[in-house]
Amino acid sequence: LNSINGRRTEILKACLIAGENDRGLFHLTVPTGGGKTIASLAFALKHAVRHQMEHIIYVIPYTSIIEQNAQVFREILGQDNVLENHCNVDYGDSEELKPMQLASENWDKPVIVTTNVQFFESLFASRSSKCRKIHNIANSVVIFDEAQMLPLEYLKPCIAMMENLMDFYRTSIVLCTATQPALDSIFDQHRRYIELCPNINEQFKFFKRVIYENLGIIEFDTLIERLKTEKRALCIVNTKKCAQQLYEQLSGDGVYHLSTSMYPKHRKKILAQIKERMSDKSKSCVLISTSLVEAGVDLDFNSVYRQVAGVDSVIQAAGRCNREGIEKKENSKVYIFDINGMKTVPGQSLQSSITKGLLQDYHDISNLECITEYFKRLYHFRENDLDKKNIIGEFKDWKYNFETVSEKFHLIEENTRIVFIPIEQEAKDLLFEIKNQGYGKARMRKASQYCVQIYNQLFDTLYGAGIIKEI
């Protein structure tokens, strides 16, 4: 038990035993590195066999984690038993892959890996093409990975839908995370859950690999100077603009930059360069990024700098530091800071201010008590925003306004436009194909690897200046 693999095995065994439980609500609260992906799959398989359930559905916030997890599941369960269903997956037009294309439309495979957006928007949809999957969600084990990532504005409707699936569709729900949100107050007061991870407090102490240090408010130049002295460091800031400014100031050998302003293919290329550089222990590497590296990116740094954000985000960032526990935790620091004069990201100021308050009260913000307190405060202050568009109201008094709900329910708000960037030759060839042969599904999925999303205001400016053209 005093080794990482020993602890992972303990958690895995506990999940297998718990698989014999009746259908219902389960939590799997496992610290980073505790093997929650395999443990949750083991629980789901045992539970599905016990109750003759038909599918295991993994619901994940980021496509980057989906691709990673789906590959793990394929290695265990075989290629044909796992279906990825999200915007970046491409089953092409070949006869060989047609069954997978059809399966992706109605989720007709034993294990389905999908996004929060695909899952919930199918359930709240009014179009038959979106609703085709619903009969295959019934009698399934549904696992929400990184459950704390459910958008606050839709939290109550999402929880209400989970309860509906458990009560009427013979479905079991697993909320899986290292930072379990305090959802008891939102679920029905009579709803009970079973925790799958044994001895949670002890597990969190064992897997603690870093020391948190609060730097408070610092100057931009001070941050630059600190990063210049680091050999292997990751710095995560809250805006793309700030990330770009830091990168430009630091720019040099071994300094890298990642943000969603770069199209997916470009990001993958940069990640490959970073991994190659980090494989040589003698070389320095400093990465400046936005929060996109907090999940699904397999990188390991000696130090992590995280601009103040929600406690869950800070803990996610800490997961990129001393990942395998090889270094002493005293030598693996996570520095929390804010930059003097830097504006707070719209919609994130409450999360940041709650974290600042908790940094005064708790020496270690990864403490389970601190995590629970963070979510309690967040849900208390945002109580009136947890169903911001009154989705639940549309189902009261025997009203079933699915068309209205479908128009209201968008986990990703539609205030952005997609821009295709044909810099690489493959993208230019693809653009030529689209112009001459039209928008096929497979072509559009390939095109998504060369696309970025920009806000409407910026789009209008660029379009007006003739920088962006319509295809």
Language-model-detected regions and their locations in the chain:
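Conserved strand-helix element at the start of the C-terminal RecA-like helicase core
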Residues: 55-66, 226-251, 255-258
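Conserved helicase motor
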Residues: 63, 83-97, 238-241, 255-272, ...
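Interdomain hinge/linker at the junction between the two RecA-like core domains of SF2 helicases
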Residues: 172, 176-228
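Inter-Walker segment of RecA-like/P-loop motor cores
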Residues: 78-124
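ATP-dependent helicase/translocase motor core
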Residues: 1-26, 374, 397, 414
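Walker A/P-loop
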Residues: 22-44
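C-terminal helicase lobe and adjacent C-terminal extensions/tails of nucleic-acid helicase motors
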Residues: 166, 221-228, 241, 245, ...
